[in-house]
Curated annotation (Swiss-Prot):
Interacts with LRGUK (via guanylate kinase-like domain). Interacts (via C-terminus) with HOOK1 (via coiled-coil region). Residues 326-339 have a biased composition (Pro residues). Residues 832-899, 1452-1520, 1569-1636 form the SH3 domain. Residues 776-790 have a biased composition (Low complexity). Residues 707-718, 761-775, 1293-1305 have a biased composition (Polar residues). Residues 1-22, 215-240, 295-364, 697-811, 1251-1273, 1292-1330 are annotated as: Disordered. The gene is RIMBP3. Residues 995-1083, 1088-1184 form the Fibronectin type-III domain. Gene3D superfamilies: Immunoglobulins (2.60.40.10), SH3 Domains (2.30.30.40). This is RIMS-binding protein 3A. SMART domains: SH3. Residues 21-143, 409-442, 480-619 form a coiled coil. It is found in: Cytoplasm, Cytoskeleton.
Amino acid sequence: MAKDSPSPLGASPKKPGCSSPAAAVLENQRRELEKLRAELEAERAGWRAERRRFAARERQLREEAERERRQLADRLRSKWEAQRSRELRQLQEEMQREREAEIRQLLRWKEAEQRQLQQLLHRERDGVVRQARELQRQLAEELVNRGHCSRPGASEVSAAQCRCRLQEVLAQLRWQTDGEQAARIRYLQAALEVERQLFLKYILAHFRGHPALSGSPDPQAVHSLEEPLPQTSSGSCHAPKPACQLGSLDSLSAEVGVRSRSLGLVSSACSSSPDGLLSTHASSLDCFAPACSRSLDSTRSLPKASKSEERPSSPDTSTPGSRRLSPPPSPLPPPPPPSAHRKLSNPRGGEGSESQPCEVLTPSPPGLGHHELIKLNWLLAKALWVLARRCYTLQAENKQLRRAGCPYQADEKVKRLKVKRAELTGLARRLADRARKLQETNLRAVSAPIPGESCAGLELCQVFARQRARDLSEQASAPLAKDKQIEELRQECHLLQARVASGPCSDLHTGRGGPCTQWLNVRDLDRLQRESQREVLRLQRQLMLQQGNGGAWPEAGGQSATCEEVRRQMLALERELDQRRRECQELGAQAAPARRRGEEAETQLQAALLKNAWLAEENGRLQAKTDWVRKVEAENSEVRGHLGRACQERDASGLIAEQLLQQAARGQDRQQQLQRDPQKALCDLHPSWKEIQALQCRPGHPPEQPWETSQMPESQVKGSRRPKFHARPEDYAVSQPNRDIQEKREASLEESPVALGESASVPQVSETVPASQPLSKKTSSQSNSSSEGSMWATVPSSPTLDRDTASEVDDLEPDSVSLALEMGGSAAPAAPKLKIFMAQYNYNPFEGPNDHPEGELPLTAGDYIYIFGDMDEDGFYEGELEDGRRGLVPSNFVEQIPDSYIPGCLPAKSPDLGPSQLPAGQDEALEEDSLLSGKAQGVVDRGLCQMVRVGSKTEVATEILDTKTEACQLGLLQSMGKQGLSRPLLGTKGVLRMAPMQLHLQNVTATSANITWVYSSHRHPHVVYLDDREHALTPAGVSCYTFQGLCPGTHYRARVEVRLPRDLLQVYWGTMSSTVTFDTLLAGPPYPPLDVLVERHASPGVLVVSWLPVTIDSAGSSNGVQVTGYAVYADGLKVCEVADATAGSTLLEFSQLQVPLTWQKVSVRTMSLCGESLDSVPAQIPEDFFMCHRWPETPPFSYTCGDPSTYRVTFPVCPQKLSLAPPSAKASPHNPGSCGEPQAKFLEAFFEEPPRRQSPVSNLGSEGECPSSGAGSQAQELAEAWEGCRKDLLFQKSPQNHRPPSVSDQPGEKENCSQHMGTSKSPAPGFIHLRTECGPRKEPCQEKAALERVLRQKQDAQGFTPPQLGASQQYASDFHNVLKEEQEALCLDLWGTERREERREPEPHSRQGQALGVKRGCQLHEPSSALCPAPSAKVIKMPRGGPQQLGTGANTPARVFVALSDYNPLVMSANLKAAEEELVFQKRQLLRVWGSQDTHDFYLSECNRQVGNIPGRLVAEMEVGTEQTDRRWRSPAQGNLPSVAHLEDFQGLTIPQGSSLVLQGNSKRLPLWTPKIMIAALDYDPGDGQMGGQGKGRLALRAGDVVMVYGPMDDQGFYYGELGGHRGLVPAHLLDHMSLHGH
């Protein structure tokens, strides 16, 4: 070195003083660096120790992971083996089941083959036996015939010949028996044995099962398979056929040997592996061929060989590698006792194996196959048992291996490894935390200012601190990376374990797959270890480089740079670091708000998305609403248009109606004027008629031909353009004064032609027959014969008619009842009666009992029949149908239409005077529609009828209201009449109606509703719509339908539309449908119980009523309503209640039944909070129940004064006639012992009408006929037409067990009644019990339901009762209901003291009759032992004199009428303006009437304390005066009605002390056979000549007679009965059951 060379630090060595401070600083820095280097080396040594420890820990973890992997692999392998064994076992079981089924099928086939072979052997044996017997018989005959051998003089040569012959026969027999037959038998047995061997081979070749059998075989049974062979061979010398026996024994022995060998082979095959199973089976089955061949030999050495072969084959039953198992017990039954083996006659003596030798020795071989199958089954069972034991051993070994491969220590090791792994993870985390803390400490130490230190030292310290911090962070990250690598290694280990578990290396031969898997895992681990070592070396090299760079930099820096440069660099670095720090702080400060803003923006975005979704949903909803609103607006506009058009049509219809009303008024005035004109014309024509009759009565007077017909040809008739009415010359001479009237009529006809009705004049009309009564209808044959008997001619049609109808000109023949000049008699005879009837039921005469059905007419319910004359003695009318057929009509199937109601036209008000001449084309329509002789009918125009009256042959009186419309409609009406349209609906003005009318609902429940209507034509079907959807199609003639399956509480809209054929659709019919809306009920009623049964109880006098309770849900409800219990009804009357929803039975005592002797059936109803259910299926009361009890003999009318709450009225009434008893000599008019009440008339109680609830009473088919009205108003005629339509509806339904729709109840029911009147009806002859109970009345709905049920049972029980024959029982039921309603009236005193005083005064002009007093017990306060009436009792009396005098005043006479049908003026009245003045009443209701009928056939009446008008045609007067000897009700319309009740049928009534009635007559016990009440359906006369001498002792019957029948029907079909006091035989087929109590 040069002398002036500078020092490394820039100081000269020659000047040490100047360089001392810098040297000190450098020295300090060197010491600091050395110190830092020492610390770094120490830290490196520590990190190396930690790294070594981590490597050791890693190796340990790898080893533990490897062990864990092996354990998991073993566990998965064991699971897989267990699953495989289970699947194998399942497959074996399935194969076993299939094999068992196949074996059973093969056994069945083999049994069938054995049976066939057995039958063949039996037949061959029988043939051999027959041949042997034949030979024996021949031999015997030969010996018998050879009689010289037995004689003493016979030679020895003949005897020798005989013996030789016998020997030849025996040899032949033996040859045939032991030769050919025995060979055949042996051959068949050998073939059978071959088949069995093949069968066994097939079974063993296809056997795969391993069933598990329990038990061990019976050694005695096993020994029995080998023992019988010597016995059989030793005992075979006694058999007659040794060859056959030997053959069988040899085959049996060979079979035993073969099967013993096969058993061993099967056992060994089962113990081997599955791969060699088929080869073992094949090798084991190859030995069967020599065995089958040896079985055909007949040597004795084979049994021994088989035994010798069986011994060495026995050890093969177990495998070499498995331990020897004891044989299982055989499932075969124990062998039979030795005595059974000696019985050769029983081939199936035992089921065991010891019975086989006996079966072989017998001629029949069926036991051989059975025994062989048993042995084969046992062998198979034994083989299966061996296989089962092998499976069990394998399972046990598998379990042991599983236990050895997965010990308890392995689980503990796994747990410890998991704990260690958790500890290592925590240690690594603590190391990372410690490194971070050291870094923070170093930063604080470096950043702290050191006093006396220069800035350059501080900068160097900071640089070293940062470098050290980086090194420490890198060193701290190394363990974390190792930890991650360990975790990745663990995951790879798990993946490898899963791959090993699912890979193909885990086979049964684990010697191949196990080492392969371990080798792969070790190789991967070694690779990972080498990579980790390389990583450690790389880290070490990086540390060494950092250390080398750190040591060389200060030396280079000291040599190459000055302190200033270092300082500047440090300052620059510091500034840059500060700038970076500030930037980082600013960026951090900016990042926090940005992060918050991002989160807020994200939250806002989510909210915006949710709001967008909600807005989209709202938009869709609003769009749907907008569409709906548009649709509703469109519908509203359409409805407004319809409404506007409807209003216009309504206004036009109103104007038309006003015009029609004006026309009707004018027409009525003209009609009255025309009524007077014919009367005047009659007087004028009477002398002319007499003169004409005198001319006709002259002898030799030729018949006059029609004058106009002979003079005017058909061409002139067709070509004429105006109607011409010609009169005959003599008419001008006779009736000249009427010529002006005729000219006026002809002028009016020329202006407006109209249809004229055909009519005939009757000079003298009886006042009893109304003038409007229709007469006979003409048939086509009669109408075409007008040229022979007609006295007038037809005229051409008018110009306004159609061409086709105008061109048809037919001659009209006068009716059978015509003028006196046509009859040819000297005096005018009376016109025969012509009535219009309606068929109530369908009737086919060929199905009836009559002898000549071809003379009767078939009827359809609703058809109209024209009746001529009166009913004959057999109960038949002579009638004519609408289509022209004539014949006999049974009277009990039809009902007369009232005279004021004629279908198709309203009646005329005056009689016609003569025949008329019609325009052409209208006579055919008149033949179809009018057919009247007393009047002429035209077309109906809103209730107006065009009447044409002809005064005589010189006068034509016509009345024209509308010329053009009616003339155009006439042809259409004619065609419609042919189509079957009802006549009241055909004639309309402008538009014809076809829509069904009077559409209303009935019996609306929660799930069903019944709809009825009145159809316009019974020949067209109707379509029923529900909510504008087609629901059903009803056939023609049906006017009701029932909707089923409806939802409760739902609004529905029902529509009924008529369906017309295509040819009728061309006509505009207007409205063709009718609509009605309804709402179903919310829920209920509950369902009725099922399986009702009535039985006698063990105790006498007690019945057990049991039923199946109704099904209820968890809430205890049925059909939506809460079930509260059950009610038991006997014949419609409640007898007890059971307050339990789950009750199933109850007891009824004899005392609970009010009239038990007459009740027949018991029903049960379900009670709920909303009412009761319908009746269940009734159960019959045992007939022997009432035989043991005698009904106590009580007075028929009694009252117990001690109980003021109730009283019972009992009086004898015959059920079929129901009237009061006649006066009795023992009956006193006034009893001094009574309470002082004078006797009044019986019907006085009926005359009162207190307010009571309106019970819905159904209109039966046999309602009362309406009276004829001589001069009624137009409104009355319209009402009658409506009434006819309503009857059409009622009569279209089935007559049997049908309830017509009832008129709805009227409001205003009175609830202020404090007492309740009940009626208990009984079928016993002669009793009706009326019971009045004081106390609050029932609720209206319950009372209404109870009355409906009683009435329904009564109506249903009446069944098929013809209206004409059932009138008596109808009025009997009417009277019964009247009694019931009037007994309710006894509770109220609504008539006041004045009327009560009036009723107490007896009528001076009425006879004192039999009285029945009903005493009111509510006012009695003192008990009495005697039965006496109360002081204020109401008395019911039966007047026998004139009509009852009752009214509002003393001088106002009043009559009593009974309502024949229901009437509601708001619905049925013809004049709606006067409907407010009319009264509402129901059928069978009693009404008080004052005065006579007014001009409109109305009475002034009182009903329900209201005074108003009632129509006379719907009521009948009750007259019980002295002039009526037969005690019948009299109707103004019908005359005498059938009798209500005859008192002759009773035994009598008396009034004892105390005014109580008792029954007179015999009081003996009731007979065992209860008498029955029946009604005669037809007339019967035993003395009419057809019976001959057999008519003695038989009763004559009239239709409607009520007969009391005793006992059953005899073998000839006759009952023994009583009628009118006479007893005798009555034919059973002419009687119908009748009762009033519902049965």
